């Protein structure tokens, strides 16, 4: 192989390697696409994106869509949003959808909403096509004690101006539930609620429940209504059971006091009997003393014994007869 041929091969190989590195590092195809679409992005801008570790296709392709839709944007805006961690493609799609629907939405506002964690494209779509939120069954108790369960469907539209810092769907559902419960609870009879379910939606809708939220409530419709438990009867039953237990406790207390009083009286009776026995034991001593002193004669003593014997006989006659002895 001659030196001239070797040199030619080296130059050709080096050129091919240089071209491969160039086309790998510089997105020439993307630059041609942007130029053909009428979006003027220089090669040096694309190289700068590579150096800043920005994927050029993530910037140029959304920029082409925006320019074709009639929205004026530049690479600096999209690149800064990309470096901030935002979704450039979703923001551009949201701007295009808002532009088509005649909704005023700037790039700065859309980028702020996207960086706040909200889906700005879904918000724009919800502004055009309202969303229906269905609540679970909400239970309220009318003044007559009957539980009424209602299910509501809330039609909401996204409020783009309040997407950042506004409350979400959970707050809307909670506020509507509170309004339904208060409306049912203010009715004297549950039948009035069953006859006029639209009264609930009208009352709740006038409360301004969408304040401070990211949505605008368009309508509240009662989808289903049903009767639950008789809460008043349950409460009365529970109260009666509690009163019964209280009365039983008081009766038991009185019974215990009566038993204690009975035992006290028995003790008093035994004490009195002991005193009587003691007094009876002193009678013979007193009689003996009276006989010694001459204050009691012999005949008086004999009469006393006769009276005592007569008393014992009357007691024996008045005593009940044993049935077993009668049978014998």
Curated annotation (Swiss-Prot):
Q: Which UniProt keywords apply?
A: Cell membrane, Membrane, Transmembrane, Transmembrane helix
Q: Does the keyword Cell membrane apply?
A: yes
Q: Indicate how the chain sits in the lipid bilayer.
A: Multi-pass membrane protein
Q: Where in the cell is it found?
A: Cell membrane; Membrane raft
**Pfam families associated with the record:** FloA
Give the transmembrane region(s): 9-29, 30-50
Q: Cellular component per GO?
A: membrane raft; plasma membrane
Q: In this entry, which stretches build a coiled coil?
A: none
**Subunit structure as annotated in this protein's UniProt entry:** Homooligomerizes.
- Which family does the entry's similarity section mention? Belongs to the flotillin-like FloA family.
Its biological purpose is as follows: Found in functional membrane microdomains (FMM) that may be equivalent to eukaryotic membrane rafts. FMMs are highly dynamic and increase in number as cells age. Flotillins are thought to be important factors in membrane fluidity.
This protein is called Flotillin-like protein FloA
